[in-house]
Amino acid sequence: MASATASISSHSVALRDLKAARIGAVKQQVAAAPAAGTAAARAQRARAVRPLRAAEPARQPVSASAAAAPAAAPVAEDAAAAAVDAPAPAVDYEALAQELQGASPLEIMDRALAMFGSDIAIAFSGAEDVALIEYAKLTGRPFRVFSLDTGRLNPETYQLFDKVEKHYGIRIEYMFPDAGEVQALVRAKGLFSFYEDGHQECCRARKVRPLRRALRGLRAWITGQRKDQSPGTRAAIPVVQVDPSFEGLAGGAGSLVKWNPVANVDGKDVWTFLRAMDVPVNALHAQGYVSIGCEPCTRPVLPGQHEREGRWWWEDAKAKECGLHKGNIDDQGGAAAAAAHKAGGANGNGSAGAPDIFESSGVVSLTRAGVENLLRLESRAEPWLVVLYAPWCPFCQAMEASYLELAERLGGAGGGVKVGKFRADGEQKAFAQQELQLQSFPTILLFPSRTARPIKYPSEKRDVDSLLAFVNSLR
């Protein structure tokens, strides 16, 4: 797909000309229009803007001028009423996604706004998704923007909200969490419980439920999801889809459409577009932040790190979704494996029937006594690299091939590093959490030859080259 910047100028010029033509046509129609009758009043009600917060649309009252206007002919009235009340033709959104697969973000945005009018809104998080607002402006169509204020955003994010409103002349429709629910959570578990038992509970209260309320007042929404944001969980995002997780205005499954105009755009191209259009951006980006969320759960990333490594860094890669886009998660391990991973093998050994992994002559299977011995030594004959794993964990299974290849390279001539594994689920989990820095599976530790305390591998990149660079920098 061509980058966002490659197509922006031609589309923006064309759409501005189109907008001018539309305005002229509308003025002529208004001047020639007869007085509105009952049918026009019905059409007005059908087009009424639905409030974002409401579960059901609010009916706009008929204006005094419309009420006083003479009634139209019965035949014309019946025809107009039938046109207003007739159900919209069904849309095959899978086919539409294929049709728009090669379209630019501007074209996709224009199609979305044209199809849904005031019943669609842009979800704005205060990060680089400001590009969505710029694309919407360039279409020349009216648009709405909403945002989730969790109460724990960075000051820079709130400052960006204000700048965006002034820059585009809009009012962002803010959604807030239920005060009673947040109060109960904080009183029961404290302000930072997500560091201990995961972020999902906090995100449900502060983000997911407010989003659900917002979407019940819409027929469609627009997100800034990109495939390259999280290749492990967002690789299959289409540009448009029936929302698999949330309900819209009509209620029930299939009542909400989700648009992802930048799904196929590379993050670098998004930033090229933002700089070219000179739009306001979050000041945190200049401080090394890429993916931006709540202040306690967001941090800068280093050069070479993936942007999602700055979010919920204490959890595994596939746990790094707050729930807003859970329907797009590519769950390669299956729901059962994900549930077992979250439980951490609390029941016995997690999945007792799972075959063992990391089996190779180059990988030493350590017992608890062996690990305790490694911990006691202040000086070792050679470094040790040890993976703490659970055989049922899909993330452990996914790194098996790279770990075995690493063992061959480190154990060969000139390698000089012992490679081991320690099964840390079940009855060994408490020990691993207390003594071995275990928070999630897999955890990789390097025991240097001249340092007593093991060093935990900080990244989620578990390919051979990344692991080898970690070992060589500390051995």
UniProtKB/Swiss-Prot annotation:
Coiled coil: none annotated. The active site is at residues 393, 396. Keywords: 4Fe-4S, Amino-acid biosynthesis, Chloroplast, Cysteine biosynthesis, Disulfide bond, Iron, Iron-sulfur, Metal-binding, Oxidoreductase, Plastid, Redox-active center, Stress response, Transit peptide. Residues 1-63 form a transit peptide. Its cofactor is [4Fe-4S] cluster. Belongs to the APS reductase family. Reduces sulfate for Cys biosynthesis. The C-terminal domain may function as glutaredoxin and mediates the interaction of the enzyme with glutathione (GSH). Active in GSH-dependent reduction of hydroxyethyldisulfide, cystine, dehydroascorbate, insulin disulfides and ribonucleotide reductase. This is Probable 5'-adenylylsulfate reductase 1, chloroplastic. The gene is APR1.
